[in-house]
Amino acid sequence: MFDDQDLGFFANFLGIFIFIMVIAYHFVVAEPKFE
C-alpha cells in the first residue's frame, strides 16, 4: 500500500494539478473580456 511519503507526494501533485487547472480555466474564461 502507500506510505506517508507516497501519500504526501500524491497530495502535493494533486493539489498543484488542480491549482494549474483552475488558473488555466480562469485564463480561458477571462480572456475574451480583455478584447
From Swiss-Prot:
<dbReference type="GO" id="GO:0005789">
    <property type="term" value="C:endoplasmic reticulum membrane"/>
</dbReference>
<keyword id="KW-0256">Endoplasmic reticulum</keyword>
<feature type="topological domain" description="Cytoplasmic">
    <location>
        <begin position="30"/>
        <end position="35"/>
    </location>
</feature>
<keyword id="KW-0735">Signal-anchor</keyword>
<keyword id="KW-0812">Transmembrane</keyword>
<comment type="subunit">
    <text>Component of the oligosaccharyltransferase (OST) complex.</text>
</comment>
<dbReference type="InterPro" id="IPR036330">
    <property type="entry name" value="Ost4p_sf"/>
</dbReference>
<feature type="topological domain" description="Lumenal">
    <location>
        <begin position="1"/>
        <end position="8"/>
    </location>
</feature>
<protein>
    <recommendedName>
        <fullName>Dolichyl-diphosphooligosaccharide--protein glycosyltransferase subunit 4B</fullName>
    </recommendedName>
</protein>
<feature type="transmembrane region" description="Helical">
    <location>
        <begin position="9"/>
        <end position="29"/>
    </location>
</feature>
<dbReference type="Pfam" id="PF10215">
    <property type="entry name" value="Ost4"/>
</dbReference>
<comment type="similarity">
    <text>Belongs to the OST4 family.</text>
</comment>
<dbReference type="InterPro" id="IPR044165">
    <property type="entry name" value="OST4_plant"/>
</dbReference>
<dbReference type="InterPro" id="IPR018943">
    <property type="entry name" value="Oligosaccaryltransferase"/>
</dbReference>
<keyword id="KW-0472">Membrane</keyword>
<keyword id="KW-1133">Transmembrane helix</keyword>
<comment type="function">
    <text>Subunit of the oligosaccharyl transferase (OST) complex that catalyzes the initial transfer of a defined glycan (Glc(3)Man(9)GlcNAc(2) in eukaryotes) from the lipid carrier dolichol-pyrophosphate to an asparagine residue within an Asn-X-Ser/Thr consensus motif in nascent polypeptide chains, the first step in protein N-glycosylation. N-glycosylation occurs cotranslationally and the complex associates with the Sec61 complex at the channel-forming translocon complex that mediates protein translocation across the endoplasmic reticulum (ER). All subunits are required for a maximal enzyme activity.</text>
</comment>
